[in-house]
Amino acid sequence: MEGFLIAARFLHFTAAILLTGVFAFECLVAYPAVRRSGAAPGSLAGLRRRLGWLAWAWLALAIGSGAVWLVAVAAGISGKPLGAALSQGAAAVVLTRTRFGEDWLLRFSLAVPLGCCLLASRRAGGAIGWAALLLAAAMLASLAWAGHGASTPGLAGDLHLTADLLHLLAAGLWLGTLPPFILFLVEVSRTGDTNWGAVAAAVTRRYSTLAIASVTVLLAGGLVNTWFLAGTVPALVGTGYGRLLLVKIGLFIAMLIVAAVNLLRLVPRLGGPADATRNLIWRTVAQLQGNARIETALGLGVVAVVGVLGTLPPGLHTEPAWPFPVRLDIGELTLGPRILLAILAVAALVCAIAAVAATAAGRYRRAAVLAAGLALCLAVGWIPLRPAIERAYPTTYYAPTQPYAAASVDRGAALYAEDCTLCHGATGRGNGPAAAGLPIRPADLTEAHLFAHSPGDLFWWVSHGMDEGLMPGFVGILNPDQRWDVINFIRARAAGVRAGQIGPDLTTGAAPEIPDFAFETGRTQGTLRQTLENGPVLLVLFTAPAPVERLRQLAAAQSSLDAAGAAGNRGRAGRIIGGNRPRCWLAPFCRHSFVRGECRAGAVSRAR
């Protein structure tokens, strides 16, 4: 069923893109160029007939594939076979009660007047031709509401949808115009008239201008779509969606290279001296035909990938399985190496683009020099980049399924006591009862290096073990949520130990993050995370029995809090003292709490 849906999407997108391209080539490229070259518009009568039949074929394919797409969606939603989805009314429900059905009806309502335009006698560049172009473009643009862009909420969704819409239109103006351009070149070759060389040059230059504008829009729209649907390197290389997106980008780059050869090497030949040999003109036209066919094949590959991508969850909504044994942690670098890497990255990009352009133009010596510059940038960049290389695992970029909150920490404490204390010890310092008999001492889970690893790294070790089996994996013992609970407890306890080592002086170093927790003050309930959304918070955590002397000191410091912006409300333990920023809490924590500390923006900033 999924393959059927993908095939229907591919055919429908292809038909809509190519249908727009037929009218765009007529109205924006062929006839304006013919008029400018001084040739008689009637000389393209044969091309007009062929383009008309081509438009009918694409319109029929759009209608047929759209109907199949509707049935496939109805079958997928209802869980029925294709025939049953059609005969038992599932398709009618999708058509009348879903957004997909509304968009489908819009496209097919546009197909009717478009067919009427094809039936009418169209003059080159006349009003009917322009009307047909607008109708076909509207059909193509409406497909944006059938993609992921329509599901993004808010203003971001408006931006995403607009980018998707422009992306589709640009595809119609570039990829869609390739088959008509090929037909035009075939017509030029068929005539055998050298006077057509000027017409071919005018059409090709105008087509190149349209292609450059379309590619610019495609690049901008593609960047926006990638940001919303992948957005991160792990999502690009570690998910099925991201890897398919990279395939699409690779095919697109190949199209750009072929187009660059046409623009920089072949088009100038057509616009050369008037006494250029006939063989040179026809040889150039033949090469343009071949390259246009290659571009078309690559473009259809891009559309095929789009057909699959629309059936997959975006990379940002999928757990990425990191495929490499290492990763880059740029945060480990100081400012100087970061600036150097940024400069080298820009230089490498410029060298790469210039080298491709020089190769396409046939300037191979210049391309070799630029390739050497690219290699030099990469070699020099390796030196400052080495400290940022870290060991990585398939789960390195996993997001925890359990929130980093007090409830999860408490559950993890019980699991840790049952499964981990024997080796790591009750305090987590690697001094459990069995530690002395092990050839490698268990890791100290309270040291600062714990925070150098991502939660996904910890998840891999807890799941699959480490040190060649000395630490066993817990895949068959704890379910994924339980493993995340254990990790949250380990992180919380290490944060508490680290907070206890902080002196009275403020530092610029990153402080460990405090887990979220719920609180109640009178009739008001909330969480630390919710409160932090309203501004900085001064948080004091303690365990029973309450540190009475310390609480008195804090009460005496109320004037300092007032000076910092807090309201002058005094409270008792367990209540907020200060209604405005910075808020101060005196909050009893669970039995596996941090040491007493202050929290600013979610992190311990100074021991109390």
Regions found by a protein language model. Name each.
Residues 1-384:
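Polytopic transmembrane helical bundles with strong interfacial aromatic enrichment
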Residues 295, 528-555:
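Short active-site neighborhood of thiol/selenol oxidoreductases, capturing the structured segment around
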Residues 392-415:
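Electrostatic cytochrome c docking/interface patches
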Residues 406-407, 417-440, 465-473, 493-498:
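Periplasmic/extracellular electron-transfer cofactor-ligation site
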Residues 430-434, 546-561:
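Typically the conserved alpha-helix immediately C-terminal to a functionally engaged Cys/Sec
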Residues 437-495:
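Extracytoplasmic electron-transfer domains, predominantly the class I c-type cytochrome c fold
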Residues 488-518:
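N-proximal helix/coil linker or "cap" segments that precede and/or mark the start of modular domains
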Residues 568-571, 579-607:
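Short, internal strand/loop/helix patches
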